[in-house]
From Swiss-Prot:
InterPro entries: AAA+_ATPase (IPR003593), ATP-dep_Clp_protease_ClpX (IPR050052), ATPase_AAA_core (IPR003959), Clp_ATPase_C (IPR019489), Clp_protease_ATP-bd_su_ClpX (IPR004487), ClpX_bact (IPR046425), P-loop_NTPase (IPR027417), Znf_CppX_C4 (IPR010603)
SUPFAM superfamilies: Glucocorticoid receptor-like (DNA-binding domain) (SSF57716), P-loop containing nucleoside triphosphate hydrolases (SSF52540)
One GO CC annotation: HslUV protease complex
Binding residues annotated for ATP, in chain numbering: 117-124
Keywords: ATP-binding, Chaperone, Metal-binding, Nucleotide-binding, Zinc
GO biological process terms, semicolon-separated: cell division; proteolysis involved in protein catabolic process
Species this chain originates from: Geobacillus sp. (strain WCH70)
Family the UniProt entry places it in: Belongs to the ClpX chaperone family.
Domain ClpX-type ZB as annotated: residue spans: 1-54
Official protein name in the record: ATP-dependent Clp protease ATP-binding subunit ClpX
Pfam families the UniProt entry points to: AAA_2 (PF07724), ClpB_D2-small (PF10431), zf-C4_ClpX (PF06689)
């Protein structure tokens, strides 16, 4: 419908209402007019939108050494694992930039399997890699997955988490990273194929095969089970990097048997056995994973295998104090906001590390131990103006004495130890 000014009979812009005399140009369309000013405004809006949604690509992929250096800022130890991950991730995104083919040579996808004990840094490494590359990242727990049609989560729900992490920008999600934890829990119950249905073990491995390799998956936007009458989000998993991690308890005896070392036997060199046992996981081969219960096709889609070592006492002490996000630094900053200086004695840090080793929780257990120690401190000190410094001693960690509190004049505040009723 043409818009005219009733008084002068002039044409008007259908968007802003300005007349032909008020603008430089008026462009006619079927039933509408648009002025040059509105065209310019629309162009700016479209360019801004396209700028946000332009093809997601990595112009400057950090080199493996650069990736390793950034990982060092957040993750203590695990040097071999960092090196393997840095190379694998660099090659993966270089492959994406090249379009998967260079001079008719097809570059295959390199998903990663991380094997290491609880609390050794598997999840943190994957999270930090995603942060370095600024790509969407999602964590999934393999234990909640079941084969399609059974109670539990479908494997497509993993992809939904990644899409949500990318704010439903599917193109960005298609170049993200998914970390699947507890992957060892979906091993089949025995090395031999089962004649009965294993819906949470081998069945899940079979269901994961396609998305690991690369496929166009249909994902329900609201999650949950699929049904025929709902809409789906289509996502190509070809360029999604999958990192699978697990503790793989029971894998070491399998490696020992392959290497010809007896698990139990007379005349064995016990000292040599202890030395070898520390590095057994680093000698893992695909055939060991097959014996553990992963199916051949699944192992074949995880070509990069890297192992993490159990963290020793010194590594745990370093984790408490050295990374940018170290737990001790966080508590020091929190108390600094209340005008109190927090100090942990070296022996106190070592005692915390020993407790984590005893609990066999690795780095993951450090926070819960420190939170237990710091609860009363964080409760009391914000209300006290006479405290300038708080020192956590080894006796505090052991539960024998309260922390040492120092006044502004440097004198120690005498405290009575709280006894449990």
């Amino acid at each position: 419908m043409f818009k005219f000014n009733d008084e002068k009979g002039q044409l008007k812009c259908s968007f802003c209402g300005k007349t032909q005399d008020q603008v430089r140009k008026l462009v006619a369309g079927p039933g509408v007019y648009i002025c040059d000013e509105c065209i310019e405004l629309c162009t700016e809006i479209v360019e801004e939108e396209l700028g946000n949604e332009e093809e997601f690509e990595f112009k400057d992929i950090p080199k493996p050494k650069e990736i390793r250096e950034i990982l060092d800022e957040y993750v203590i130890g695990q040097d071999e694992a960092k090196k393997s991950l840095a190379v694998a991730v660099y090659n993966h995104y270089k492959r994406i930039n090249s379009g998967s083919k260079i001079d008719d040579v097809e570059l295959s996808k390199s998903n990663i399997l991380m094997i290491g004990p609880t609390g050794s840094g598997k999840t943190l490494l994957a999270q930090t890699l995603a942060r370095i590359l600024n790509v969407p990242f999602a964590i999934a727990d393999a234990t909640s997955l079941t084969e399609a049609g059974y109670v539990g989560e479908d494997v497509e729900n993993i992809l939904l988490k990644l899409i949500q992490a990318a704010d439903y920008d599917v193109e960005r999600a298609e170049k993200g990273i998914i970390y699947i934890d507890e992957i060892d829990k979906i091993a089949r119950k025995s090395e031999n194929p089962s004649i009965t249905r294993d819906v949470s073990g081998e069945g899940v491995q079979q269901a994961l095969l396609k998305i690991l390799e690369g496929t166009i998956a249909s994902v329900p936007p609201q999650g949950g089970r699929k049904h025929p009458h709902q809409e789906f989000i289509q996502i190509d998993t070809t360029n999604i990097l999958f990192i699978c991690g697990g503790a793989f308890d029971g894998l070491e005896p399998i490696i020992k048997r392959r290497l010809g070392k007896k698990v139990i036997g007379f005349g064995a060199d016990i000292q040599q056995s202890d030395v070898d046992e520390k590095n057994l996981l680093s000698k893992v081969l695909p055939e060991d994973l097959l014996k553990f219960g992963l199916i051949p096709e699944f192992v074949g889609r995880l070509p990069v295998i890297t192992t993490l070592e159990p963290l020793d006492e010194q590594a745990l002490v370093d984790i408490l104090t050295k990374p940018k996000n170290a737990i001790v630094k966080q508590y020091q900053k929190m108390l600094e906001l209340d005008g109190v200086e927090l100090e942990f004695e070296e022996e106190a840090l070592r005692e915390i590390a020993k407790k984590a080793i005893e609990r066999k929780t690795g780095a993951r257990g450090l926070r819960s131990i420190i939170e237990g120690i710091m609860l009363d401190v964080m409760f009391e000190l914000p209300s006290r103006e006479d405290v300038q410094k708080c020192i956590i001693t080894v006796e505090t960690v052991r539960g024998n004495k309260p922390p040492k509190l120092i006044r502004h004049d440097g004198t120690v505040i005498e405290q009575e130890r709280k006894t449990s009723a």
